[in-house]
Structure formats: C-alpha cells, structure tokens
Amino acid sequence: MGGQCAPTAGDRYTPRSEADVSDPIPILELPHRQARALLRGGAPVFLSIDPVEYHGPHLSLRNDHLVSTGLSRRFHAALCEARVGQPWPFLLASTLDAGVDPTQGPGSRAVAFRELCGLVVRACEALADLGAERVVLMTFHGAPLHSIALQRGVDALLARGVRALAPLNLLLVDVATSPPEPFAPALAHVPEPERAPMLAALRHDFHAGFMETSFALALAPSSVDPIHRTLPDCPPITPDARLLRLARAADRVGKADVAAELRVVAHGVGWSKLRPFPGYTAQPRHATAEAGEVFVRYAVSRAVPLILDVFAGAPPPPPPMAWMEQLTLGGRMPGLDIPLEVVADLAP
C-alpha cells in the first residue's frame, strides 16, 4: 500500500551551482516522490508536442522537437534571469511525437485532429494529477489544427487551476500579421537584390526554409545536413485563388488579421501543389546559425514576458486561425494530398 511522505527541506529544489539550473530534468523519469517534490515549488513543466515530419533532405524528421527543446531551454534561462535568486529547475515532460497535418514525405506520421486532442488532454491532465502548477506546451509545428489541439490541453489545465499556455500561438500571429522589419538583421548577410524580396516574403517561409533551417542551425546544429547550402530555391508559389478572394473579402469588412491568415493558408495550399514537391519553402541555402540567433532572440523577447504574465494570472493567447476547426468540420475533412512519388529527391 502506498503512503505519503511529508515534504522536508530537502524536497525543495536547491541548485548546487548556476550550471545546475539549466540542466534538463526529465520529470517523468524521476522517482514519483522526487517528481512531486520538485513540482511543489511551482516550477513550470515544458511539454513538447511535435510531429515526426518530413523537412526536406537537409533537416531531421524530429526537427520540430529539436527546435522546441532548444527554445524551451532558452525560455527557461530567461525565466530564471527574471527570477533573480529564485531559479526554477528545468523540468521536461516526455515528448509527444504526434502532430496534425504534417508535411507529407518519406517518414512523416500523421495523427488525426481528434486523436491528438485526446492525447494532449490526457497528457496535460496527468501532469495536473502529478502536481504541476505551471505548464508550457511547446511546439514548432504551425499547422492550425495542431495549435487548436494544444489549446485543448491548455483549457484542460486551466480548468484544473493550472496556469498554462502554448507560446507559439503568439509567435505564429506575429509572423502572419506583423511587419517583417524586426527580422531584417537575420538577412544582413544576404546580398541584394535578393535581400529585400526575401524579407517581404518571410511570412510565407513556413517550412524547412531559410527561417526554420536557421532556427535549427542555432539550436540543434548537428541535426542539419550541409546540403542545405546547395539546395535549389523553392519554386515560385501560386497562392490558392479562392482563399485569396476570401482574404480580400475579410479586408473589406475590416478583418485584417483574418485576411493575413487566409493569405498564409493560400500560399500553403499553393505550395503543396508544386510538382515535384520540394518539401521546403524559400531559400534554405541562405540559412546560418547567426540568422537563427536573431529569430531565437525575437522568440525569447516575445514569449517570455507572455509566459510570466500568464503565470501571474493573465489569460493565455488563443490559437491563430481558430476558424480552421469549423472550416474543416472539426478536422474531418482530409488534409493536403502530396503523394510520395512527387516528393523531389534532392539528395545526391
């Protein structure tokens, strides 16, 4: 029969050195008593939910997980800086290797929307049962239904009195709707006349291109194949005409953010129809770790104040493109079809 152990002073987290603060602690691999003791101090748990997904020939199938974990480390470090003298341990929950609407290609695994909703909610409720008081749901997968599924987990945690958020929601909105000028330093090394059009089109660089490859070079460099330097640019994308018409209609009624989201989706649909299908957007050849650091610093500057606000009681940001759930009949409509035989073989 199990029994309860009264918490002692030794149960509280006391780092042996400054380096200990950044050492990841896989909370679900600790003895149960120790895991609960660590959570009693209110330290946030980072839960990564990312697909196994094709990212072209130059990135790994778990690239989203690797970037999520790297960002979790940077977010945690910034949170500790904000809590001078009161560091939190870096608590990681086991990753859910699952995602809705992954880019199709060799090795990709698709999970249905409703199935992922169930997986996320059960994982979050289990963390609440364990004693988590704060949870950060991390992902680097921007599919709208994926973000909505993560929000189901956020809502389940909030209902249990746990403060929680998915910070990528804010970053996705930034990329889709905000001017790209804050990212200009990431393109300082790109010669003109390429630089200006690259910056203007950055919001449409949504998969395994210059931006994501730079993130990976900054956060998980050993996972990036140098072939990215010689890959041909993604061919020009013809956005879906019907979605562009909807975007113009949204603009006319004053829904500028919805219009911007519809344009991103229109480019995504057009990208999926490229034949052969490259598996990446934009120009991975220009990606560098230095550019990745620009993107990482921006992510930290936007996400960490938000995390602190939510931990203090503010509401978390909603998922972008929440209308996608209704548009797809709750995820029942099939996603984009990219047969394996049309995926470009760009590896030598």
Describe each model-derived feature in a short phrase.
Residues 10-134, 140-348:
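Extended, histidine- and acidic-residue-enriched regions that form the cofactor-binding/catalytic faces
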